Amino acid sequence: MRLRLIFVIGIIAFCQYNSSAQLKSERQWPTYRGFRSCGVLDNANLPDSFNVVTGYNVLWKTTIPGLGIASPVIWDDRLYITSAVSESDKAGFKPGLYGDVRPVNDSSVHEWKVFCYDKNTGRKIWEQTSCRGIPKIKRHPKSTHANTTLAVNDKYVVAFFGSEGLYCYDNDGKLQWKKDFGLLKSVFFTMESAEWEFASSPVIFDNAVIIQCDILDNSFLAAYDLKTGKELWKTKRDEYPGWCTPNIYEDNGKVCIAVNGFKQRGGYDFVTGKELWTMSGGGDIQIPTPVIGKNLIYFNSAHGKSSPIMAISTGARGDITLREGETTNSYVRWSQPRGGSYMHTMLLYHNKLYNVNWNGTINCLDPDSGKEIYTAKLGNSKSFIASPVASDGKIFIPDEEGTVYIISDAPKLEIISVIPMNSICMTAPAITDGRIYFRTQDNLYAIAKK
């Protein structure tokens, strides 16, 4: 009887530990747009307003050297971010709507850096230079040589700088391993001279790091052992160059990987890399990350002739490409041929699907049916790139010139605050308990109630 009691107590303790550990993991912000790239952290107690000039509700501010549009990531009390530093590349960003596809004409020596800060104080804990040299690929005027967001967990920090390599550090900044993939041609597929730099962020799940490399030649999806860097699998993809980050979803307990694409949008087995389903069509420059809902995966894209938004079943198998004129089939719950965003990852929040377009138009949709809840324009801002995030009924959306719109999660557009940061902002914010972090061209701000 005593042994049985000990056994039962042990099982209860084990379950409570695992539940606590899982909850802890879900409240971290470990990759682009947080846990599973969802962009949501409720019960964070964030302020409704702040002022970067007076310091109202600004907990701290620090200058980030160089240029980067990598979002901050957070694990426990540490915040991590990357940048590419050059003494000669002073072009900065070119905000606004324009059709110029030419890259920035700069061939100066850069240093690719990873920074670790105390999230509470802004104190720099460590800094590492991953590599140094002339970039192998030039950058778009809205881009940098440090576009990809880090992936972190309680032990490791993974940085992917495209043609400059994949790097894994421990959380104290000691290099564990690195990999060189050679030249990854992140270019406009119809104009090879239009080099735009790499931007697909790595994803950590379990014991593996996942990377999606949709490039001009030899596109692939691959998994590497997080501890050693050993290749676990590598799957070829027939795809144009793209800049989208993969995401993790589950189908009846099976862990899968969702990837956006034009010729080969699809799902893959996490363990083997085997393709589970595929679908062609959409915007021919794919950038937004898939968003995971309840038994559905949401995709959007925009460029060329099509700009769809669609909801795909997590149980999809085989080729599920829609025939001409179709908007649904056995695995496509619903789709819209127009309205998808070129740059923005959508936000699924409180049973509403938010799609922000480059000009600041918001489409709020019913995630189950795709029916419009509302469409509205955010203020007078001309251009948006940073994807939205949400907490406690508030949605935070920065425009390119650094104005932050805080709107209510309501059945119609309700603007709570409009806050100028007076500096270009191309980066999705990051949220932790009591704080939200904004990266501008030069600075990183920690915003909290004071």
Protein language model features and the residues they cover:
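Bacterial Sec-dependent N-terminal signal peptides
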Residues: 1-24
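Noncatalytic, solvent-exposed loop/strand surfaces
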Residues: 21-450
